[in-house]
Amino acid sequence: MPSAIVVGAGVFGGSLALRLVSSGWEVTLVEQYPPGHVRAASGGESRLIRSAHGASSWYTRSARRALELWRELERESGADLFVPSGVAWFFSKPDGWGAESERVLREEGVPVERLAPEEGARLYPSFDGTGLDSILYEPEAGVLRARDATRVISEQAVERGARFVTGTAIPEGETVSVDGERLEADRIVWAGGAWLAGIFPGIVDLRVTRQDVYFFGAPAGWESPSVPAWVDFDGGVYGVGDLDGRGFKASPDSEGPDFDPDAEDRVPSGEKEREARAYLALRFPVLAGAPLVGTRSCPYSLTSDTNFLVAPHPEHERVWLLGGGSGHGFKHGPALAEYVQGLLEEKEEPDSVFGLGARPPGGGLRAPWIETS
């Protein structure tokens, strides 16, 4: 029986641990805090699950597969995780990323509709399409209860035989030290999220930023799944209908300030709140002046081109590094775990797109660059 240590029980690490133990591996899952904890990027209330990824058929297929696996996890665990609200994309131009997304979605057989701006009124109780060229609607997309999903993944992994260890992990060559206990396995995967770059300074190049989210009090009729989740691609704002009474979520999607996940307070920016409010007033007029009922800040960890990091350690052949998923982790986590399992079992070859080498700056939280077709 092959053995693995997975460090980090977020969506990447937890999904991999569950995948491996379900496939007959002996698995130890290490996490410094309880799964779904508020310090992590995987600890939020909701995450968009959608397949549109511009011209990238690889990411589109991965996201579609991940949704299948989330639904499978629901059936196996009995948990209610995915909310089929649909996702509406707002575009101000007829070509570019939106047009490429529509083309690839249709090629991959993913349901998608191209709507005129005025048709947004059938999706939302109050909608102003001023400045939009079109709406791209993914009816089978939706929202995942992220914190719940993270917890369920770890619970299922333990139920299937994984050992869960709580503590601070330190790399020691091809072993792991957890609060003085030395752990060994055939494969070690470090999936430390916002902490990964600090664990491997000089090897892992990730920028960690603080991303702020705002929840507004909305009248009846704005609940998810009654209204679709939404993304204004050119405006750089996204949101989710009121899920589980938390409030109507709206957040600017621009990269936030650099952030230390251990030392800094998680206090949302007043400037970003004003941007969110301005957008609500523009696009959903009835929500202008809606009261702020909640906030959250979470760390994002991003590579320079926003593709994932999936690479062997340059000095230790049994050690792998997995990260750079913030903004995309839940869209791909279970499917990426399948890919990583293939790498660990030497059934797949590492792809330089996800490697440790230099990457061109650019990309964006919504539109990763990728050369793999």
Q: Residue locations for each model-derived region?
A:
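N-terminal Rossmann-like FAD-binding beta1-loop-alpha1 element of flavoenzymes
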Residues: P2-L29
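C-terminal catalytic lobe of FAD-dependent flavoproteins
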Residues: F284-S373
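Conserved beta-strand-loop-beta-strand element in the redox core of flavoprotein oxidoreductases
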Residues: P171-L183
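Glycine-rich FAD pyrophosphate-binding loop
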Residues: S22-S42
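Flavin (FAD/FMN) cofactor-binding and adjacent substrate-gating region
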Residues: E72, F90-T166, E172, L302
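Dinucleotide-binding Rossmann-like beta1-alpha1 core, especially the glycine-rich loop
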Residues: S46-L123, G236
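Flavin-dependent oxidoreductases
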Residues: S15, R50, S57, E181-V293, ...
